């Protein structure tokens, strides 16, 4: 699902920006207020693109989305990562599953408190990998809230048109 397979799927980069909330250390992306998505009626980043839309709804409900980022863990700072949305979501920190919202469902939330991850060492850099699959054909909700200072990670290099 989450990688290009020639003849099976295609991809394109879709950036999102987490906005720092006033007078806080929280960063939020919310499809209901984001200028790119608020008028689309949900998180629909590829309407009319790639393999097209579902039926005649004008919405492309069937897609996956990946975020590959990193952060420096600071022990005792109360850092959290919260996702609210529908359908499948898996979040891994340092290769360990920390959020599992698998399955087709209405919008639900799950939070990971990083201080509860006893394998993390303060001052070290860790990966955060986020996997989202939109499979249902009614809504697409997508909200991230975090206190982590997430960094961009360069995408892997390609040696050919498809690896």
Residue ranges, per PLM feature:
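Acidic/polar, compositionally biased interaction segments
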Residues: 1-163
């Amino acid at each position: 699902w989450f990688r290009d397979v020639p003849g099976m799927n295609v991809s394109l980069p879709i950036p999102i920006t987490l906005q720092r909330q006033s007078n806080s250390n929280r960063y939020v992306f919310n499809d209901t207020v984001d200028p790119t998505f608020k008028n689309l009626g949900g998180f629909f980043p590829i309407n009319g693109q790639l393999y097209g839309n579902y039926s005649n709804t004008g919405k492309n409900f069937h897609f996956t989305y990946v975020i590959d980022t990193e952060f420096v863990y600071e022990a005792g700072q109360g850092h959290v990562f919260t996702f609210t949305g529908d359908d499948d979501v898996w979040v891994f920190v340092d290769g360990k599953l920390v959020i599992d919202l698998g399955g087709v469902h209405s919008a639900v939330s799950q939070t990971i408190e990083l201080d509860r991850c006893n394998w993390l060492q303060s001052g070290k850099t860790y990966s955060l990998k986020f996997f989202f699959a939109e499979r249902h054909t009614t809504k697409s909700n997508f909200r991230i809230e975090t206190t982590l200072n997430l960094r961009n990670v360069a995408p892997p290099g390609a040696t050919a048109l498809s690896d």
